[in-house]
Amino acid sequence: MAQLYFKYGAMGSSKTATALITKYNYEERGMRVWLMKPAADRRDGEFTLRSRIGLTAQCEAIGPDCDLRRRYAEHDKVDVIIVDECQFLTGEQIDQLRELVDRENLPVLCFG
């Protein structure tokens, strides 16, 4: 059974690097990853996730009005969801992620 994981730490504690390494590990096993961050995080560009150690990946920017269940339905098959800076999602979006875990048996890893 899938779970929703919340990994947190202080600034500079390698949360983004861990998220990107996790993405890589899933993709190495042939799994499809939906990588996202809040749209408000534009420090490295709207659709780029970059760690302080230089790891980078394209991601989806999620605005506060985005219905994550609807976006999930629009995606091709997804095996895991990874969210960076999840503390900036709305409470409703966190509930939507929980619903995806429960209904779709989809692991969700949140970093913040």
Can you name each region flagged by the protein language model?
Residues M1-A73:
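Conserved P-loop
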Residues T22, Q96-R103:
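Catalytic-core regions built around general acid/base machinery
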Residues R29, R103-E104:
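Helix C-cap/helix->beta junction micro-motif
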Residues D84-C86, G112:
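Walker B catalytic acidic pair
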Residues C86-L97:
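Conserved ATPase-coupling elements of RecA-like P-loop NTPase cores
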Residues L106-G112:
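Structural recognition of the conserved hydrophobic beta-strand(s) that form the central parallel beta-sheet
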